[in-house]
């Protein structure tokens, strides 16, 4: 039985990045592969007609390529951190149905996937936590969620396509909270110019 996702819900925000990763896997397999995205989309009951129609456009194809390069960059940075902190916490902020934590897994790190409760509900159903992995439902601006993270071996946080939806002051506050809670931790994220952010956040 497929998991149904309704239009105009928080859960619907999972669809576009997941579809973009699937599209890039199909279009540019030599650059990027996300078999999890391909598998998960087959398990979701949703009207994909709009996404499928736009996938033929040059803009959407470029967007899919951008998503792939972003994910590759994030994995590179996280894996580089794990070389010197092999038992670190790998924290995916605004995880959605993204499997990057597992893509970075070195066999000894701990993986934490943080997102809103509605999103975590879908993730627990379609992408349940594996060994050394936890899905944590939370508001990312709430520092209380950080208490559930074991950073005794270090911590590397990454946010993929997340901060576009935050105000500048919210990002500053979150980064300060993380710095206070996890001294010496690393944060990896993507950014864009103001015009691009407005287009992305529509």
Protein language model regions, located:
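Active-site flanking residues adjacent to catalytic metal/cofactor-binding acidic residues
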Residues: 114, 159-160, 189
